């Protein structure tokens, strides 16, 4: 059996970027990377904001994305995100993605520098920016529902004392704890 070939990036010009589309080429996670000009209208794409590491220090790439029959080692922190897309039937929905660790050749210092200069444009032109906070925990749904609840009561015309009493009620302890867990995830402190 032949050793898989590592993916080799084609160079991009300073006014270009790569976008990624997941495709079905068999059992492994596969994709295509295509270069587009920033001077022309871009196809509709989503951008992903996420953390590169889980513990803050070590970049781990223990799985490969197949691109043009070549293997691209990909950050472990992306695998759960891709698995969620797949479980929701959204992995192969013909959507373009901009995911920095894949769309930028991380081995090319000059390209990284050029692409970093375009990040504001890349994120602002995305149809959606998805913030991947990490895998779902046992209290993630509680935290997200509590955020919606806080938004709702913030719009009501409560006097501050009544609002304080509502939010300090014992029934909210678990919800505050869940929200604290959500807000202590690495994504919030990565910059």
What residue ranges belong to the model's regions?
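Short hydrophobic alpha-helical runs that function as membrane-insertion/retention elements
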Residues: 129-132
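Hydrophobic, mid-to-C-terminal alpha-helical segments
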Residues: 111-117, 127, 178-191
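Metal-dependent phosphate/diphosphate-handling catalytic cores characterized by acidic Asp/Glu clusters
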Residues: 1-98, 104-114, 135-175
């Amino acid at each position: 059996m032949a050793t898989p070939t590592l993916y080799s990036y084609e160079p991009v010009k300073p006014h270009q970027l790569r976008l990624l589309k997941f495709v079905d080429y068999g059992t492994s996670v596969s994709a295509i990377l295509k270069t587009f000009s920033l001077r022309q209208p871009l196809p509709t794409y989503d951008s992903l904001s996420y953390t590169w590491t889980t513990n803050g220090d070590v970049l781990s790439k223990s799985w490969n994305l197949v691109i043009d029959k070549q293997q691209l080692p990909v950050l472990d922190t992306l695998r759960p995100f891709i698995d969620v897309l797949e479980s929701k039937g959204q992995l192969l929905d013909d959507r373009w993605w901009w995911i920095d660790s894949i769309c930028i050749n991380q081995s090319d210092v000059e390209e990284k520098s050029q692409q970093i200069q375009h990040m504001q444009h890349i994120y602002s032109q995305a149809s959606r920016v998805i913030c991947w906070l990490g895998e779902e925990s046992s209290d993630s749904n509680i935290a997200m529902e509590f955020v919606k609840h806080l938004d709702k009561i913030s719009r009501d015309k409560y006097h501050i004392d009544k609002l304080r009493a509502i939010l300090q009620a014992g029934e909210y302890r678990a919800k505050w704890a869940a929200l604290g867990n959500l807000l202590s995830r690495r994504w919030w402190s990565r910059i």
